UniProtKB/Swiss-Prot annotation:
It comes from Clostridium perfringens (strain SM101 / Type A). Belongs to the CinA family. CDD domains: cinA. This is Putative competence-damage inducible protein. It comes from the Bacteria. It holds the Pfam family CinA.
Length: 412
């Protein structure tokens, strides 16, 4: 089975609404072993929608649409799908009864145009929608072609697909696709591509790198007659990739870097405090996202001015005068100072120039120093980021968390 995901709606075409439905459907279809060969977005125009159906069926046998099932004149999906398969629309009395009950239970007034949602071809397989007023449907045409019509709102579309479409589609496939995601930080997409380039041509399993935000994900996908067989195909490939990428792999699946670091801190009972300048508390804020971090996170200080660095952290006046606030020496004293004052095993410091102004030839915008004081031993790292203010701050925060992760993994 080959499928196309088609979003119908001018609001998506114009970018007013983000099409999250396509991502959900692509993942779910992959899990069923159904290949998605194309995704498209079509405006609310009869001629263009029919043309899109024509083009899609040149390469696939199944079209899954989202949107266009509402009560207004520009909701055209099911009418045009019926026209494409030469089916006649008729009032489905059972749907009208359900719709009237829905409005009564929710104390809403049912207008005449709402009845439009109860018209489907008599051949249509109806997909119930307990979360809204627009039922979905499956229309089966000749030559094993079908159009699956789903509502646009994700809270309606997702349960409808899971509860009704998945059992229907399962009858047409004898294999499954299973994916394993490895999350990588510390090397860019191009560098990782160099390290695993010979594996990218593999067919089963396939290996594909993707840049996502600041980190990179590596997806290993295998096809098998069942989940167990697919996972057995993935295992040796994963082992080889881990051997090549080492501790640049920080997690699997949907785990975030902050979750990995938070868990390490809590599991190892490593108390921590932060002193930040250009990041303005981003490291502290990100760590606090982890549930249970209160066991180990003691204090976070935003010491933006030189006076604050001296008063709160004990940075020496001579250090600031001789080396400046953005320096290895200042970052070192900041990390030591916050660890001492907060009485924590770890002190984190950040000082830098996020921009857009404030840079010099010697100390350009994007120059950042970070310090880690762990059990009295202090290390400092220098970063140079070529980016705008927000990206400099975000990249600093992520790199410091990754550095902390690697240091924590060395501690028994």
């Amino acid at each position: 089975m080959k499928a196309e995901i088609m979003a119908i709606g001018t609001e998506i075409l114009l970018g007013d609404i983000v099409n999250t439905n396509a991502q959900f459907l692509a993942k779910e279809l992959a899990n069923l072993g159904i290949g998605v060969y194309h995704q498209s977005v079509v405006g609310d125009n009869s001629e263009r929608i029919l043309e899109a159906f024509d083009n899609a069926f040149k390469n696939c046998d199944t079209i899954i649409t989202t949107g266009g099932l509402g009560p207004t004149k520009d909701d055209l999906s099911k009418e045009l799908a019926a026209k494409y398969f030469n089916m006649e629309m008729c009032l489905r009395e059972e749907l009208l009864c359900d719709l009237e009950d829905y409005f009564k239970k929710n104390n809403l007034e049912m207008t005449e145009n709402n009845k439009k949602q109860c018209y489907f071809p008599k051949e249509a397989i109806i997909l119930p929608n307990p979360n809204g007023t627009a039922p979905g449907a499956i229309l089966e045409g000749e030559n094993n072609k079908r159009i699956i019509l789903l509502p646009g709102p994700p809270r309606e579309m997702e349960p409808m697909f899971t509860n009704h479409v998945v059992p229907y589609l399962s009858k047409f496939t004898d294999s499954v696709l299973v994916s394993k995601i490895l999350r990588v930080f510390g090397i860019g997409e191009s560098k990782m591509d160099d390290l695993v380039c010979d594996l990218l041509d593999n067919e089963n399993p396939t290996v594909a790198p993707y840049a996502k935000n600041i980190d990179v994900i590596l997806r290993i996908t295998a096809k098998g007659k069942d989940k167990e067989e697919a996972e057995k195909l993935i295992a040796p490939m994963e082992k080889e990739i881990r051997k090549r990428l080492g501790d640049n792999i920080y997690g699997e699946g949907e785990v975030t870097l902050e979750e990995v670091v938070g868990k390490l801190l809590v599991d190892k009972k490593m108390t921590v405090s932060t002193a930040e300048s250009c990041t303005g508390g981003m490291v502290a804020s990100t760590l606090i996202n982890y549930p249970g971090i209160s066991e180990v996170f003691m204090e976070g200080a935003v010491t933006y001015s030189n006076e604050a660095k001296m008063k709160r952290l004990g940075v020496k006046k001579e250090t600031l005068e001789d080396f400046g606030a953005v320096s290895e020496e200042c970052a070192r004293e900041m990390a030591k100072g916050i660890a001492k004052n907060a009485e924590t095993r770890i002190g984190i410091s950040i000082t830098g120039i996020a921009g857009p102004g404030g840079g010099t030839e010697e100390k350009p915008v994007g120059l950042v120093y970070a310090g880690l004081c762990i059990d009295g031993i202090t290390k400092v790292k220098k970063f140079n980021f070529k980016a705008d203010r927000q990206k400099v701050r975000t990249r600093t925060m992520m790199n410091v968390l990754d550095w902390l992760r690697r240091e924590l993994e060395k501690i028994d």
